[in-house]
Curated annotation (Swiss-Prot):
Top-level taxon: Bacteria
Descriptive protein name: UPF0302 protein lin2035
InterPro entries referenced in this protein's UniProt entry, alphabetically: IDEAL_dom, UPF0302, UPF0302_N, UPF0302_N_sf, Virus_scaffolding_prot_C
NCBIfam families recorded: PRK03636.1 (NF002965)
Length: 181
């Protein structure tokens, strides 16, 4: 997650985007211009790669990509009517609005990268290999911690000259080391 993106950076991006890309619907351009013209709204706008899990979102497409031209949703209500979206954005200016933009070379655009944020609601999907690596790391950490604790107890047994405890702990340590191999 990157540091907070300033209002000016978001406004500059919207202006750049509208100058560089032609929207599939002119209403999408109007909505973006309206947002850019109101700092109090821009403050609550977040540009994300997908709208999964977001309570309120706007998906807009420029020419050159295969995506719906205009989608707005709030909760379980979804609409392609820009006027309803505009009305909601205007009235609920202080609610978080997640915006997903579809345009050519979006993922390689440095301008978009500057304002793009991680979707805080998107489920994190780990590949099987990543899960196995995480499990191995956890196992190794627990094993290392247990071994260090056991070595401390062995040192204490030596310091107190407790031969029975010392031998018992050494056997546990040897068994632990054998199991790890």
């Amino acid at each position: 997650m990157k540091a907070s993106i300033s209002i000016d950076e978001k406004k500059d991006f919207i202006r750049w985007f509208l100058n560089k890309h032609q929207m599939k619907t002119r209403e999408a351009m109007w909505v973006l211009n309206y947002i850019a013209g109101h700092d109090q709204i821009v403050k609550y706008v977040h540009f994300v790669d997908n709208l999964e899990g977001c309570a309120r979102g706007l998906s807009l497409s420029a020419h050159g990509v295969e995506s719906e031209p205009f989608l707005f949703f709030k909760g379980s209500i979804m609409t392609t009517d820009p006027e309803k979206a505009f009305h909601d954005i205007r009235l609920n200016w202080d609610e978080e609005l997640y915006v997903e933009l579809h345009f050519e070379e979006a993922m390689t655009s440095p301008e978009y990268a500057l304002v793009r944020e991680d979707n805080p609601f998107a489920a994190v999907k780990l590949a099987e290999e990543e899960k196995e690596m995480a499990d191995a790391l956890i196992y190794q950490s627990v094993h290392q911690f247990s071994r260090e604790k056991l070595l401390q107890q062995i040192d204490e047994a030596l310091d107190t000259r407790d031969e029975a405890t010392f031998h018992k702990l050494v056997r546990i340590l040897q068994q632990m080391d054998t199991e790890k191999e």
